[in-house]
């Protein structure tokens, strides 16, 4: 098992963890319905890039 030889200072510890924060998912707005959805995913109504691609229960 690896064991560090010297204690890592708080500054170095912070630098090591600087990219561990959470980011928000990029969202897109469907132009035909105005719904918000994840990028490169279909909207809940079944639209993708302004075209109906999947039939939903409401249709």
Swiss-Prot record:
It comes from the Bacteria. Keywords: Ribonucleoprotein, Ribosomal protein. Residues 1-59 are annotated as: Disordered. GO terms for molecular function: structural constituent of ribosome. One of its GO terms (cellular component) is large ribosomal subunit. Residues 49-59 have a biased composition (Basic residues). One of its GO terms (biological process) is translation. HAMAP family: Ribosomal_bL32. Belongs to the bacterial ribosomal protein bL32 family. This is Large ribosomal subunit protein bL32.
């Amino acid at each position: 098992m690896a064991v560090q030889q010297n204690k890592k200072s708080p500054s170095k510890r912070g630098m090591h963890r600087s990219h561990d924060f959470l980011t928000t998912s990029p969202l897109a707005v469907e132009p035909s319905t105005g719904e918000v959805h994840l990028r490169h995913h279909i909207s809940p109504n079944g639209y993708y890039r302004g075209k109906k691609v999947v039939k939903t229960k409401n249709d």
